[in-house]
Regions:
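Conserved NTP phosphate-binding and transfer environment spanning the P-loop NTPase/kinase superfamily
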Residues: 9-156
Length: 156
């Protein structure tokens, strides 16, 4: 068994020469959260940004605007390196959890409200605050200690 992890793991150059029996798995959050009228409140990209903002703040001390400044490069890298090869995956695993917006809402809203002069990120800050207004908060004690979600809530 050979396991490659990371954004380049599905690149054809890495899989070249491996037996066709090799198995590619593409793992990412891929859920949009909608209201009862079918209006999207939060899409998968905003969930990913939320996860990053909270994680970077908790574990790296990066303020939300620092993460948002890097976000453009993250999306560019995704377009250049991940999207082209994601279609070669044998299986797609959606890592979104239905309860995530309820879990992150209060934290991300507080972080974003503390952001002074978001400048070019004003639209993103306002959109996220408005989106999370629709989700009531739930406590982190409901999340199992073994859950990968712990990376984003800092309970571990």
């Amino acid at each position: 068994i050979l396991i490659f992890e990371g954004i380049h793991a599905l690149q054809p150059q890495l899989r070249q020469g491996l037996a066709r029996s090799n198995f590619g798995i593409y793992i990412h959050p891929n859920t949009s959260y909608v209201d009862q009228d079918g209006r999207t409140l939060l899409d998968a990209r905003d969930l990913r940004l939320t996860r990053r903002i909270i994680r970077d703040n908790l574990h790296r001390g990066t303020p939300p605007l620092g993460t948002m400044r890097m976000w453009k490069d993250v999306l560019r890298g995704e377009l250049l390196y991940m999207k082209p090869s994601s279609g070669t995956a044998d299986v797609f695993v959606n890592t979104s959890h239905d309860y995530e917006p309820f879990l992150y809402g209060a934290v991300i809203t507080e972080l974003l409200k503390q952001t002074q002069d978001p400048g070019e990120n004003r639209e993103t800050v306002d959109r996220l605050i408005e989106s999370y207004r629709h989700f009531f908060p739930i406590g982190t004690e409901l999340i199992p200690q073994s859950s990968l979600i712990q990376e984003f809530i800092g309970s571990k």
